[in-house]
Amino acid sequence: HLHQYPLKIWFFCVQPSLQGGETPIVDCRQMYQLLDAKLREKFEQKQLMYVRNYTEGLDVSWQDFFHTSDKAVVENYCREASIHFEWRKNNGLRTCKICPAISQHPKTGEMVFFNQLQLHHVSCLDPATRKSLLSMFGEENLPRNVYYGDGSPIEDSVMAEIQAIYREASISFPWQQGDVLMLDNMLVAHSRNPYIGARKIVVAMGEMFQKEIVTQDMEG
């Protein structure tokens, strides 16, 4: 959901876990093809709105995320990236950013389902964590969430369909010490399976790409 991101990502296995810890990968071109045509069209038209609430003591602070404690620097960054921002009580910050759910790869021209729905949607939390966060903060104040670009909620049924497609299309392998994995970050999505025992996978990213900024009809 940032206005720039790496096109290349590398993984190096320093120490594989005793059990689990795979890095499942999914072809984002295949995800695009497997999506229901009506749902794909809906995402293309509506896009996505990522909402972040930076609250002291909960998840990441805005100071750590933006690497500054200067509010003016944060505000300038948000304006340049077309991110709506709102300073809240107790030194909190709320941001909203509209991004595509579906993109065209800048080099291959292929259409890809490229987004961070799984990372941000509240339905992807485990049920106990979701219930606890909603009871404490309410949906509006969750640390992170994602909606359709018009602000309407993305249905849990839609997220369940997307998760099922990810599971169907995913490929995983057991890490071995010394393994190197290089991915095109737009063509291939990745995740991480739970694991037992010590595990160390180091990651490097490069070839930063700045996407076209989507102008929002908001003030901030």
What do the predicted segments below correspond to?
Residues Q4-G220:
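Active-site environment of non-heme Fe oxygenases that use a 2-His-1-carboxylate facial triad
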